[in-house]
Amino acid sequence: MTRVSFKAQMLRAREEAIVASVNRLLAEKGFDAMTVDAVAADVGIAKASLYKHFSSKEELAGAAMIAALDRAIAQVELLAQDASHATELDRLKALARWTMQVQLAGEMPSLPSQNSALRAALVANKAYGDRLIRLSDLLGDWIICGQHAGRLDPELPPEVVLYTLFAKACDPVLSLLKAGGSYSDEQIIEMLTRTCFTGLAR
């Protein structure tokens, strides 16, 4: 086994601290309000040192999204091995709940959909693209199996179900209900899981 040098370990630890800071700032402020200066100050390093790891604000956001996708993929793989979630529908519901828990905890990065520079950077980021495809494929298998088993509406295109699940990661209803203070996190998650999978009709 190749031994990692102390310097390499320190650089890796600093990079992880930067990504963790970006993730939190994106969740709290959003991409437009987050600044490179704020990230550097939060980590406790000079901006010049930060640029040794990431060349732009867009690259910082990409690193945070890669970390978020890695976390989601790990959760999917965990659910796939959990006997308490026997059906694909059970697993999709569990993943939706987990996603909302992460958002309510302030750990889900929030990115704008209309920022052309950010979109171009993410499209060009192979690591991000590979993980997004991996997660989509894993969930796509569950969705198609669930439709074939009659547990999910077979008339809906699978991508509609997939994008609906992805939307739970940035659902504004979560923060609105939490800010209202009338419901616990558990109640909010349960209600939004019901509206996602059962709908609004009685």
Identify the meaning behind each predicted range.
Residues 102-123:
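Amphipathic alpha-helical segments used for helix-helix packing
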Residues 1-29, 33-42, 59:
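Basic, helix-initiating cap at the start of DNA-binding domains
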Residues 1-2, 94-98, 137, 141-149, ...:
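C-terminal peripheral helix-coil segments that are non-catalytic and often amphipathic
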Residues 63, 77-107, 158-165, 186:
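Hydrophobic alpha-helical connector segments
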Residues 21-25, 98, 102, 168:
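Short amphipathic alpha-helical elements of helix-turn-helix/winged-helix folds
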Residues 44-54:
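Short hydrophobic/aromatic patch on the recognition helix
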Residues 61-68:
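Alpha-helical DNA-contacting segments of helix-turn-helix folds
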